[in-house]
């Protein structure tokens, strides 16, 4: 497939609430060359961890070498670290459809979910409605909240809402099926606050996280960032209590022990994210071309159509990113067989399912290798 180059669209200042970050719109060949792992493997597992770009690792190494030579203290060190936090926050806002002041830097989707649920102060008389296709990264924090958890089929969430509901907590795209739970419609039709697990949507489809109350993401998946990087978008930061304060929660350091929270969602930052990791994330966010969403949807559609001819596919048509199917043989053995052939996919334990992740970097050859490996 040939991907056409396109002119870089200039965003007028009055149209853009945050900076828009794109690459120089490279070809598919340029993009694939940025990810060395693609030279060897049909890497189809970004739903767990995305491939690392060479520039991501180089940015991390550069920061480590500065620390090695200059130490990790003094004004230059802290100024560089704080500037990197601001840079990454702004870039994430651009990628997630939010304002920088709405973005907290976290370590994972689960981290963000815990921050939200701890700050809501829910009790056993309160209900949280969720779906039956959620990841433990959301389910665990829900049960730790102390509220009653009401679980509904993924297409019946709205019907499960009652007058005791205090929060709806669902994924944007299910980690199991890849299907969209349409959280914007759920929010519009119920009017209740909503916490969205965006782990399988950020970097896969266009996201306007600022339209939700809370939106948590992991950056090592489809955004291809380093491990232990994440973000939480809080639409109205002043309305959520800071229940898990970190060093960055306070605006000033007062000798008398008083506490004034920082402005915006920065008050929810979950501690000191390593500057090398943030530098790597900043570089990773620059790799994604502006045609990433169209390409991801196209390759997922091709993958689904091909698998549907031979297997039971549980992913609905028209989804992007994940394609999940039920194999006719033992999934553990089949995933291992594929790995030995250089095709990386994921088994979903206990469900007799195999999940394929198609990103903007996925090629037709990757899909052919998958199909050949399936026999």
What kind of feature is each model-predicted range?
Residues 4-5, 22:
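Intrinsically disordered and other compositionally biased segments
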């Amino acid at each position: 497939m040939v991907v056409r180059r396109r002119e870089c669209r200039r965003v007028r200042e009055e149209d853009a609430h945050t900076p828009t970050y794109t690459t120089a719109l490279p070809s598919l060949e340029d993009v694939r060359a940025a990810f060395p792992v693609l030279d060897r493997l049909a890497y189809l597992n970004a739903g767990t961890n995305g491939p690392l770009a060479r520039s991501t690792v180089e940015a991390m190494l550069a920061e480590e070498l500065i620390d090695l030579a200059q130490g990790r203290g003094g004004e230059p060190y802290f100024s560089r670290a704080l500037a990197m936090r601001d840079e990454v926050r702004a870039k994430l806002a651009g990628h997630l459809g939010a304002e920088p002041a709405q973005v907290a830097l976290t370590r994972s989707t689960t981290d963000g979910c815990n921050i939200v649920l701890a700050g809501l102060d829910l009790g056993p008389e309160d209900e949280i409605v969720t779906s039956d296709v959620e990841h433990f990264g959301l389910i665990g924090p829900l049960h730790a909240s102390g509220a009653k958890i009401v679980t509904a089929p993924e297409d019946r969430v709205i019907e499960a809402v009652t007058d005791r509901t205090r929060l709806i907590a669902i994924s944007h795209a299910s980690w199991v099926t890849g299907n969209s739970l349409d959280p914007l419609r759920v929010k519009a039709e119920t009017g209740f606050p909503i916490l969205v697990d965006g782990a399988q949507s950020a970097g896969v489809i266009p996201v306007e996280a600022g339209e939700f109350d809370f939106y948590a993401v992991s950056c090592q998946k489809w955004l291809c960032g380093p491990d232990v990087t994440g973000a939480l978008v809080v639409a109205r930061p002043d309305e959520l209590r800071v229940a898990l304060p970190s060093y960055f929660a306070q605006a000033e350091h007062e000798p008398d022990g008083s506490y004034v929270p920082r402005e915006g969602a920065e008050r929810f930052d979950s501690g000191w994210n390593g500057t090398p990791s943030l530098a790597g994330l900043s570089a990773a966010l620059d790799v994604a071309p502006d045609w990433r969403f169209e390409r991801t949807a196209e390759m997922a559609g091709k993958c689904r159509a091909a698998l549907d001819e031979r297997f039971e596919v549980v992913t609905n048509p028209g989804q992007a990113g994940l394609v999940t199917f039920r194999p006719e043989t033992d999934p553990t053995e089949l995933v291992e067989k594929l790995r030995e052939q250089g095709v990386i996919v994921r088994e979903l334990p206990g469900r007799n399912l195999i999940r394929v992740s198609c990103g903007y970097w996925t090629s037709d050859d990757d899909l052919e290798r998958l199909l050949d490996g399936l026999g």
